[in-house]
């Protein structure tokens, strides 16, 4: 499989009480504009040049004749340039909870053959039992109101030797760092912590018998503060920061730069469950 080194994901979790509220999620992902801002900062400043999306995809191990379902496909960028992989699939279904995001995925992958597009809620997947070899759900499980119901639906979809690939964030990465810079009270026990690298294995083991955790080593080295200001203002769920004027955000970031660089820790990874 050929990978684009700038591929990235960022459905950045935000410590909002609405993170797993259906309408809040629909609003956050109704258009691709804010998501693209968050994707861009990773593409531009990540120290790991493989790209998080490429790293995730390298663990799918899609073989000839496999059926694949992605839940929460976002803009579809994960599949751009992957025609060879798509051709291997006997069936590839890309789905999202948001109509607007699914429209963007169709636009991104216009001209690609062999892809089905569906609006799907993970809690009520409209397929029969044992239909897929691989089910994918990246950076979205913390949005699911009834996570265990969603995971049971995924398990129902999988063939006997199928696997579930799901990427998520850790509790000590970008958001914790940004909140610390601005002295915002950290709500680590809220809905944003419902599926993390720290607690995800336990949640998955309630449904799956074999769970593996993989960690992605990375950070941001930001040299243009304006890009970080844009990033912060794209965080729909963090009104305390998003509503601050740019002129109040900028000096806080500049104060924490060293040698013209703002070092931002990242904590991302994925689980593979069977």
Language-model region placement:
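A short acidic, Gly/Pro-enriched loop at the edge of an enzyme's catalytic core
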Residues: 123-135
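Short glycine-centered segments of the SAM/dcSAM-binding site in methyltransferase folds
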Residues: 67, 161-163
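Conserved Class I S-adenosyl-L-methionine
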Residues: 3, 42, 48-49, 75-77, ...
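Conserved class I S-adenosyl-L-methionine
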Residues: 2-64, 77-81, 101, 165-191
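Class I SAM-dependent methyltransferase SAM/SAH-binding core
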Residues: 67-124
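A short SAM/SAH-binding and catalytic strip from SAM-dependent methyltransferases
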Residues: 133-147
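A short glycine-rich, Lys/Arg-flanked "PGG" loop and its adjoining helix->strand segment in the class I
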Residues: 148-160
């Amino acid at each position: 499989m050929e990978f684009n080194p700038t591929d990235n994901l960022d459905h950045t979790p935000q410590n909002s009480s609405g993170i797993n509220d259906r309408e809040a999620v629909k609003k956050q992902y109704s258009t691709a504009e804010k998501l693209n801002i968050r994707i861009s900062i990773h593409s531009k400043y990540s120290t790991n040049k493989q790209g998080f999306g490429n790293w995730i995809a390298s663990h799918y191990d899609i073989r000839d004749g496999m059926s694949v379902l992605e839940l929460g496909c976002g803009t579809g960028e994960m599949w751009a340039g992957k025609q060879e992989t798509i051709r291997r699939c006997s069936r590839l279904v890309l789905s999202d909870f948001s109509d607007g995001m699914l429209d963007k995925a169709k636009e991104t992958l216009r001209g690609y053959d062999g892809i089905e597009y569906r609006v799907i809620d993970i809690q009520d997947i409209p397929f029969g039992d044992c239909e897929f070899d691989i089910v994918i759900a990246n950076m979205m499980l913390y949005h699911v109101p009834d996570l265990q119901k969603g995971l049971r639906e995924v398990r129902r979809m999988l063939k006997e030797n199928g696997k579930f690939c799901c990427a998520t964030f850790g509790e000590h990465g970008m958001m914790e760092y940004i909140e610390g810079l601005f002295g915002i009270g950290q709500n680590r026990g809220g809905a944003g912590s419902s599926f993390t690298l720290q607690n995800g294995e336990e949640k998955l083991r309630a449904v799956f018998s074999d769970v593996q955790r993989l960690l992605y080593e990375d950070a941001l080295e930001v040299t243009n503060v304006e890009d970080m200001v844009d990033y912060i203002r794209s965080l729909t769920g963090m009104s305390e920061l998003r509503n601050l004027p740019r002129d109040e955000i900028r000096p806080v970031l500049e104060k924490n730069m060293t040698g013209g660089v703002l070092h931002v820790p990242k904590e991302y990874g994925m689980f593979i469950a069977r």
